[in-house]
Amino acid sequence: MEPPRGPPANGAEPSRAVGTVKVYLPNKQRTVVTVRDGMSVYDSLDKALKVRGLNQDCCVVYRLIKGRKTVTAWDTAIAPLDGEELIVEVLEDVPLTMHNFVRKTFFSLAFCDFCLKFLFHGFRCQTCGYKFHQHCSSKVPTVCVDMSTNRQQFYHSVQDLSGGSRQHEAPSNRPLNELLTPQGPSPRTQHCDPEHFPFPAPANAPLQRIRSTSTPNVHMVSTTAPMDSNLIQLTGQSFSTDAAGSRGGSDGTPRGSPSPASVSSGRKSPHSKSPAEQRERKSLADDKKKVKNLGYRDSGYYWEVPPSEVQLLKRIGTGSFGTVFRGRWHGDVAVKVLKVSQPTAEQAQAFKNEMQVLRKTRHVNILLFMGFMTRPGFAIITQWCEGSSLYHHLHVADTRFDMVQLIDVARQTAQGMDYLHAKNIIHRDLKSNNIFLHEGLTVKIGDFGLATVKTRWSGAQPLEQPSGSVLWMAAEVIRMQDPNPYSFQSDVYAYGVVLYELMTGSLPYSHIGCRDQIIFMVGRGYLSPDLSKISSNCPKAMRRLLSDCLKFQREERPLFPQILATIELLQRSLPKIERSASEPSLHRTQADELPACLLSAARLVP
């Protein structure tokens, strides 16, 4: 029996509310509707069903009388049912399944099924497998479809519902996402088009799914559309024609039997594919292969820059581990070509592993890492600093800084090193040449990390050797007695030498001209920077910090969190020059400027 599609023909105007009716809806939901004179059950439940993606054509309503369900027509007046309970259930022949969404973090490479963009945090349906971003939830089909199930079983249910006598047409060539995605309602009719109704689940699947309590409400009202029973008949046309002929095979031949009867019954042989189907299957297989290969691609691939895209303009300088050039790559950049001749496979892999760590560094006092190159040699691309190095300011240009500025440079350097150590990155070559003053007095630390380049290799095994400049080397690094002498404390020693440069304006051991003598005496503990050369206006707290950073035993040196806290406390304790609180006298009258005693004396004069 086809239920009516509209309100009763009496055309009576609804009047005031007289009561309520409790309604139990599908998917274990319930609501309360207001009873109004002149309205039918159809009208009263219309909104409650539409917001849940249902309509009266696919549901049946019961009255609950003494615990028993009694079928009630949709055109029944709602007024006599005041205070009663109604039950709305989905028709048994309507294969409706609700989504079961869960929040998921995709650690393997995944893409949204709708916007086709990278997906990390999102949602996934446990039944049909849809995965999507939260902002793509409006594109999710209203009805859940388990695409992994057998379509043949569903086709039988659709054909039974439509009478089984209709000749089905060829499947549509539209994409599956277009068929499964709800569209806006058509202006010509209040019922949706076939595109609004996705493929339902098979007949043996459960009709209702209980929504998880932890599932967010990603379906808004605008994402749902009412369903028409006629849509189920039209939906069967979008399935493959091999399922259409299986119903005609009534001879009882098994599905997998290769007998001629199975072929003559209208169902194609598994091996007889049309050229169009073969091309479509091949393209789908190629797409899956591309996605699979993309999923196993190393994330460092997106940070490796092709050499043809980088233009080297001018050589800036040469250091211990490479040559720095000014280049162009989407703007001005600094390119450091490292001194690695004929790198082995082990060196190349170690270099790429280190780039994975450096690409995650983001700090105001750290040079921005932008990419790397492995052909023809190892190279690192960083941001371009317009300013000069701290070494150039102190020892070449003789820039004069006041004590407040020097302490601020020391604080920013400690802040940047504290960030690197928090990332478990040891600089290994901290010195004034690698500290840049960018746009005024903003400190930028460069040339950090690079353990692969700063290590001597013997075949596939790295051999530890002293790396860096001699003046900034700690004693344990010079001796090389430990398997790995580089530590956070060795960076602290180098930072202590930088503090010495700031507070004295000169390099340590300037009176010794022999490099080997410096290496021997510092490694033995016979030589240390002369603290008597420190400026007389240097605060005592800075003197003590400088002395602690240059300790011979590395266990006695402080770490950068303690160093940073000490300098910040020192900065707060420095005297501040405050602006004068005096007011200008531009708008005062001459009488206001005179003292009151003079004015009173003037009045007493006869």
Curated annotation (Swiss-Prot):
Zinc among the record's keywords? yes
Q: In which tissues is it expressed?
A: Predominantly in urogenital tissues.
- At which residues is Phosphothreonine found? T181, T253, T318
Which cofactors does this protein require? Zn(2+)
One Pfam family named in its UniProt record: C1_1
SMART domains hit by this protein? C1 (SM00109), RBD (SM00455), S_TKc (SM00220)
In the UniProt record, which is one GO cellular component term? Answer: cytoplasm
Q: Where are the zinc fingers (Phorbol-ester/DAG-type)?
A: 98-144
Q: Give start and end of each Protein kinase domain.
A: 310-570
Q: What is the annotated role of this protein in its UniProt record? A: Involved in the transduction of mitogenic signals from the cell membrane to the nucleus. May also regulate the TOR signaling cascade. Phosphorylates PFKFB2.
- Its protein name is Serine/threonine-protein kinase A-Raf
- Taxonomic source organism: Homo sapiens
The gene designation is ARAF
